[in-house]
Every structure is written in structure tokens, then in C-alpha cells.
Curated annotation (Swiss-Prot):
Catalytic activity: L-aspartate(89)-[ribosomal protein uS12]-hydrogen + (sulfur carrier)-SH + AH2 + 2 S-adenosyl-L-methionine = 3-methylsulfanyl-L-aspartate(89)-[ribosomal protein uS12]-hydrogen + (sulfur carrier)-H + 5'-deoxyadenosine + L-methionine + A + S-adenosyl-L-homocysteine + 2 H(+)
Obligatory cofactor(s): [4Fe-4S] cluster
Enzyme Commission number: 2.8.4.4
Xref: PANTHER family: RIBOSOMAL PROTEIN S12 METHYLTHIOTRANSFERASE RIMO, RIBOSOMAL PROTEIN US12 METHYLTHIOTRANSFERASE RIMO
Protein name: Ribosomal protein uS12 methylthiotransferase RimO
Major place of residence: cytoplasm
The family this protein is said to belong to: Belongs to the methylthiotransferase family. RimO subfamily.
Keyword Transmembrane helix carried by entry: no
Amino acid sequence: MDGALFLLRGRTEAILTMKIHITSLGCAKNRVDTEVMMGLLREAGYELTQREEDAHVLLVNTCGFILPAKEESIQTILELARYKETGRCRALLVAGCLPQGYAGELAAELPEVDAFFGPGDVPRVTSIVAEVLRGKRSLEVGKPDFLYDHTMPRVLSTPFHYAYVKIADGCDNRCGYCAIPNLRGRFRSRSEESIVEETRSLVDRGIQEALLIAQDTTCYGVDRYGEFRLAQLIGKLASIDGLRWIRLMYCYPSHFTPELIEAMAAEPKVCRYVDLPLQHADDELLRSMNRHAGVDEIRRLIRTLRERLPGLAIRTSFIVGLPGETEEKFQRLLDFLAEMRFDRVGIFTYSREENTPAGKLADQVPEEVKEERYHRAMVLQQEISLSIQQEWIGKTLEVLVEEEVAPGLYRGRSEREAPEVDGHIEFKGRHRMIGEWANVRITAASHYDLMGEAIDEPGE
């Protein structure tokens, strides 16, 4: 008899372990929420499974940031719902940002879903599952004010050698195009002690790289301590024995302090890499979108970062087709790309979102114009990226080994590549283990990846 450990009419009944499969969509911040839910469910006695067809409970943690993410979430829900007809599935639950913004509409349109809950309801996941298994449909979405800490169980879904550490949640920036403050709530920082304790625990479990994430990582501490405290946090994390790399993701340009730049320059464990979403290069558009850093300020910041951090790899992102973007303003973006020569760039077409200031503007750009500008920007950046990649030919990089793709052929990353969003380094070598380090001489380059050969073979 299939079953689980769950509450039934006020009693706790132990039945054969019930299996749960969780699908996580969207950003790394959402992924951490998924990992916390996995920890809570496993602690409550459920068995986690990677096979949807074996699961008695299916849960999808959705993204609701832009239209393509919403469409992917809906499609995933519909695909999982089929297992209620063909598999063991007894319950389908939908979590995350999509129900936070659209729970009522979703409940009406998706009767096959047994529960909807938001990011603020993560701590209640076990009770929500129990309610559903008792036959009660759960449609209550709470305030998005949850903030996990080091005391909560967490099951890592990343490879054993790296993990995301969410140092804050929510956002107070209120960019004109973005619905995140409505979906994730106000900005709120974890305590330094909690972050350090969690990171130390992760290192004890084998991770060598901690990726610091938040909606606005550089704003860390301002709500809790009354000042920006990312520089101090870096110093404390760097003191953890066994931690090799600290990587900064989702850095807001106007919140970079001189102290942070100096901390990055002084601490060898901080990767010479920064993720710095800039969104556009026209001052009028930046102001209309409530971005607080102008183009000249951004230029100064990038020059300072490159001066203080030689070899720095900069990842950024831009939005084409923002309301009011004329051909002249778009050309400023192209000129800026050519001038600044960023290592890695994500180009996105503007997605008109409900309940955002930009979504209410009249001067929307036609979809075909957005697509045409997207392709022009991508072609330019690909040329820039290839040129930068080719500059590494003949040089040696320290590489974290992540995969053996064939006998004698390995794949990994240097400090210049973040997992999942950037390329990789493929190299020839012998007897390498996942999670080990290799010095690799670069012999070839493509737009996104590097190729090479190990020069420090074991036993030589």
C-alpha cells in the first residue's frame, strides 16, 4: 500500500513512505526556496524522488517574473497534472511567485491543482501537503515575508562542490519594469551570524564555492544594520577554512561602496567576477525605469572595478524595447556595449507586466521591433565575447573540475564563469576527480566556452 507519514484526523499515522517530486523553475533565489522545502519535507518523513512518475505528490515552484517565465510555469503545471491520470500522483501543488501574484486566477483556471502557496508560505509546506492529502484544497497565499536561516533543513540540488547562499530576500528598488517587490516583498537581510554559520556548514558538507545571491546583493545589511555590510560579510566568510571561492551575483550598481571594492580586491577568495545587471545605457530610459545609477556613474564604477580587480570578468544584462526606446536610444546601448566590452551579457526583450509603472506607459515598442533590436544587440555582443575569449589562448587558468564528458576529456569552470549562466572550460587530462582543481592551458576559444589541456597531471 502506497502512503506517507502525515496527519489524519488529528493523529499521526505511519504508512509506507510517500514520495514527493519537486520541480524548481526560475532563478537561483527560487532554487534555494525549493531546497529548503525539500529539507522540511524530508525531515517530516517524506521521500524525495527525481522521477515524476514515481511521486505521490508533485510540487512545482514557479517563476512569475516575466511573460515567458509565466508561460513556462503554466506549461509545467499542465504537464505534471497528467500524472494524476497516468501515474501515482495523488496531489499537485503549485508554489512560488506565480501564485503569489495570480492565485485567484490560477485556482479558477487550474482545478486539477490541489494547493497554491507563495514564497512566504515555504515554512508551511509540510502542513499544506498534509491538508491536501486529507482532501482539502488549499488556496491561501500569505505575505511574502519569509526569510530562511541556518537552522532550517536544506537539501542541496546543486553538485556537491558549490552552493547558493541567499543573504537577503525581497527588493525595495521598485524599478519601473519589475514586479519582484510585489511578489517577493520588502528587502530583508539575514544576520551575518546566520549566513556565516550556514556557509561553514556547507563547507563541512564539501562545497568549495559559495555564490552569494539576493534580489540586490550589494544592498545587504542596510535594513538590518543601517549601513551596507557586504564588505564586512565577505571578510567573515573568507575566514572559513576550506572555502575556496566566494562569488557575488545580482549586484546593483548604485549600491557598490568603496569599502566593498577594496574588500573584493584584498580578499583572494573573492572571484574576479561580478554579476552587475545594468538594464540600459540611455539616461532618460534609466530615469523613467527608476534606475538610480546614470550612464556616467556606471562608467566610473566599471573603470574602478577593472582598475582595482585586474582580470575581472563582468556579467551584465540589458533590456531592449523598453517603453520609449527610440532607435537613437537603442543605438546608445549598442555604442555602450562596444565601448565597455563586457565579458558576458544577457539580452532580454522587454516584457510588459501588470501592476508595474512601465506597463502603464503609452509609448510601448512593437514586438517586431523588440525582436529586431534583440538580434542586433546579440550579434554585436557575440563578436565582443569571442574577441575577449580569444585573448585567453595561451594563458593558464585554475579550473574547478565538474564533469568527465568522455574518457580523458573534462569540463569545468574558472573563477571567470558562474555555474548555469556562463560557459565552461573543456580540457584534456588524466585521472581527474569531480571537485578537484586543475591548471589548464587554453588552446582554443568559442563565443562562450574555452578549450585547453591540463598542465599539472597527477603523478607527473
